[in-house]
Amino acid sequence: MTHLLDDLAWRGLIAQSTDLEALRAAMNTGPITVYCGFDPTAPSLHIGHLVQILTLRRFQDAGHRPIALVGGATGLIGDPSGRTTERALNDPDVVAGWAERIHRQLAPFLDFTGERAGQPAIAVNNLEWTGRLTAIEFLRDVGKHFRVGRMLAKEVVAARLRSEQGISYTEFSYQILQSLDFLELYRRYRCVLQIGGIDQWGNLTSGIELIHKVEGVDVHALATPLVTKADGTKFGKTAGGAVWLDPALTSPYAFYQFWINTDDRDVPAYLRYFSLKNKDELEALEKDAGRDPAARLGQRALAEELTTLVHGATECGKVVAASAALFGRGELAGVEPETLAAALAEAGLVTMPFDPPPRVVDALVATGLVESRSAARRVISEGGAYVNNEKVTDVDAQIDPGRLLHGRWAVIRRGRRAVAGVERAG
């Protein structure tokens, strides 16, 4: 059986680490405890967090015990990592609410009951111990172990000091609070490994140094890479903003479409980062995808697996059916209103009056599927226009109000792949 560290290396998930052979030796003696922190700086986690979440899952599947730490305290402070400006401070009640939501979001990924895995995951909130510290205790018991020179040398801090913005004492202290988390988890659970993104490396090593000074033991850190895109744009962002795990912020349909639209050049890396399939399964999938690139087998596998993980198999089935139906490969009438609304919002939706009913020519122009009425007439004459998957052959045809989907929508399609929606006004 492949050792977990070898699997992580094959997947490209180890960007930097402390002594891997020492970590391997610790893992070989029995299950270890590993943690990752998630700060509630927004009402939801986003797909950028999936690398760390799924790395915790891989450790649990290999028999180790994961701790998911939600930063109810650190979320009040703000991590300067990866930022050129100071974070806005959120109200404590808001942060507490976000922390609860994030705890719930982690449940589909980690087994907190022990029913699936031998080592049940643990959920903690660092406000539990940090919130009880007085300023004097913080400075005497924790702060005295940190040397300002070393803190200033951390790349995150150094970069901010070089900038016009600078760094506040609040954010400068963040690495001390994160280090305290590692120390507290070592004391409570004998946690010996912290994982995080490569932009967190300075914070990870600060925790290692604190534990060595206070407890006299050596612990470990493992940093995952920052996910990039071949086209140079930021991973996890769309024209509409971040891709969230919360279905109220990013619909399951939009979530699915994000992965379906993955650039062919990114698919092999993303499958290794995000899929729970093993090496043999992924290599077989990559070969199949390479033989028929047009079928987008890699994108479909990625989209279906991750949508199922995040939103459940039932919801994934709905969005797969809706996606097929929108492009003429399924029955539109069977798509539920909520799923259809999300799909059309993602595709592009315009509202039009139906008194009198709009002409298909005008709908094609209004939705942006063609640039002009003359182009719309040409598309219809050439047999390339569809309303609710029915071909339109009459250039003067109107959209029949009696055939609107759920009494509200019409799906307008040009050719095989250009789709938009029309919603009845009022």
Swiss-Prot record:
Subcellular location: Cytoplasm
InterPro entries named in the record: aa-tRNA-synth_I_CS (IPR001412), aa-tRNA-synth_Ic (IPR002305), Rossmann-like_a/b/a_fold (IPR014729), S4_RNA-bd (IPR002942), S4_RNA-bd_sf (IPR036986), SYY-like_C (IPR054608), Tyr-tRNA-ligase (IPR002307), Tyr-tRNA-ligase_bac-type (IPR024088)
Chief place of localization: cytoplasm
A GO cellular-component term linked to this record: cytosol
Keywords attached to this entry: Aminoacyl-tRNA synthetase, ATP-binding, Cytoplasm, Ligase, Nucleotide-binding, Protein biosynthesis, RNA-binding
GO molecular function, one term: tyrosine-tRNA ligase activity
Ranges spanned by the short sequence motif 'HIGH' region, renumbered to the chain: 40-49
Residues engaged in binding L-tyrosine: Y35, Y174, Q178
CDD domains per the UniProt record, alphabetical: S4, TyrRS_core
Catalyses which reaction(s): tRNA(Tyr) + L-tyrosine + ATP = L-tyrosyl-tRNA(Tyr) + AMP + diphosphate + H(+)
Span of the annotated motif 'KMSKS' region: 234-238
S4 RNA-binding domain ranges (all copies): 358-418
Protein's job: Catalyzes the attachment of tyrosine to tRNA(Tyr) in a two-step reaction: tyrosine is first activated by ATP to form Tyr-AMP and then transferred to the acceptor end of tRNA(Tyr).
Record protein name field: Tyrosine--tRNA ligase
High-level lineage: Bacteria, Bacillati, Actinomycetota, Actinomycetes, Acidothermales
Gene: tyrS
